[in-house]
Structures are given as structure tokens and as C-alpha cells.
């Protein structure tokens, strides 16, 4: 059985796009997926990288071409529910900490599925605590508990550890998929 390590942060539309394709792969192949929440901003800082919108600002046609490639990917994989979040870029620190808390409590995949909907299908301002809590409640999660867990030192430490381990593994941007036997 092949194993997929999927490093992700909800801040990137690529998290949504990659996750949806991974779901199709899981349906058709014998694979195990290990979801690893990391902080994209922390990866950028550690690797001296920048978001594409910033890095390629002023490079004629670069961002336009990147948007065209994204649209082609969406069409190719029939990801018709995707919508660019009008609040983009969203500071994802709280919801990615929520992913770590969900992982610790055993419902990470469900959490990912639902938070990605709130980010990229029914776009919400997912860096506003009131919006986040309401989205959690709408998803059937205990919003109060998750909001509290985001501040837990153990959750914070695990996110830092995941992010540092990703950088040590060579990650410099997201989403990243590592496949092994």
C-alpha cells in the first residue's frame, strides 16, 4: 500500500484543489493518506519564500497565467464547487490550529472536508473568530471547544513541530504531497 503525506494549510486554494483530487485517488487506489496541518506563513518565513501573488507581482502575465492554469485544473478535475474566497488572503492560523485540535480528537478528515467548504465553496472570512465559530457550529462541531483548543499550548506546539518537520523535509510551499511505499 502506498502512503501519501499531504501537507496543507487552508490559506491556500491548492489545499482545496489537492484534497479533492486526493479523495478521488483514495476511491480508486489502495492508498493511505496522512494529513499534516502546517502553517504556510511559517514555511514561507523559514524558507525565505513568498506567496505567488507577492513574488510575481510586476512580472507581466505571470499571475494571469497562474490563474489560467488553476482554471484548467479545476475544469480537468471537475471541481465545479470551487469559488475563490473574496476575503483572500485569509490568515489561517486559527483554523489550522483547529485542524491540529481535530486531529488530536480523532476527526481531522471530517474537519478538513467541512472547513474547506467554508473557505472555498461557500467562502467565508475564516480569520474572524465569530465567523469561524459559526462555521464550526454549522458543520456540527463543538465550536466553543474548538475555539478554546486553538489556544492550548499543546496544539500550538504540535503545529510548530509539524511546520518545522515539513521544512526539514524540504517543503517550501503548499500544498505538497509526498508518496512512499
Where are these regions (language model features)?
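Thioredoxin-like thiol-disulfide oxidoreductase module
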Residues: 152-171
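Local sequence-structure signature of Cys/Sec-based thiol-disulfide redox active-site neighborhoods
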Residues: 2-18
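Histidine/lysine/aspartate-rich catalytic loop segments that bind and position anionic ligands
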Residues: 115-142
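Polar helix-capping/helix-linker motif
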Residues: 128, 151-152
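Conserved small/polar residues in nucleotide/adenosyl-binding loops
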Residues: 178-181
Amino acid at each position: 500500500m502506498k502512503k501519501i503525506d499531504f501537507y496543507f494549510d487552508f490559506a491556500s486554494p491548492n489545499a482545496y484543489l489537492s484534497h479533492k483530487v486526493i479523495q478521488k485517488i483514495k476511491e480508486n487506489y489502495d492508498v493511505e493518506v496522512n494529513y499534516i496541518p502546517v502553517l504556510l506563513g511559517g514555511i514561507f518565513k523559514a524558507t525565505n519564500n513568498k506567496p505567488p501573488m507577492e513574488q510575481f507581482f510586476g512580472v507581466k502575465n505571470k499571475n494571469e497565467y497562474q490563474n489560467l492554469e488553476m482554471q484548467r485544473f479545476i475544469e480537468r478535475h471537475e471541481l465545479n464547487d470551487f469559488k475563490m474566497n473574496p476575503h483572500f488572503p485569509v490568515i489561517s492560523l486559527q483554523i489550522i490550529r483547529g485542524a491540529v485540535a481535530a486531529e488530536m480528537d480523532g476527526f481531522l478528515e471530517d474537519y478538513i472536508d467541512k472547513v474547506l467548504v467554508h473557505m472555498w465553496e461557500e467562502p467565508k472570512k475564516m480569520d474572524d473568530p465569530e465567523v469561524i465559530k459559526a462555521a464550526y457550529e454549522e458543520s456540527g462541531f463543538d465550536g466553543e471547544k474548538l475555539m478554546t483548543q486553538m489556544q492550548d499550548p499543546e496544539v500550538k506546539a504540535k503545529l510548530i513541530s509539524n511546520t518545522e518537520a515539513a521544512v526539514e523535509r524540504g517543503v517550501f510551499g503548499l500544498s505538497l504531497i509526498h508518496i512512499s511505499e
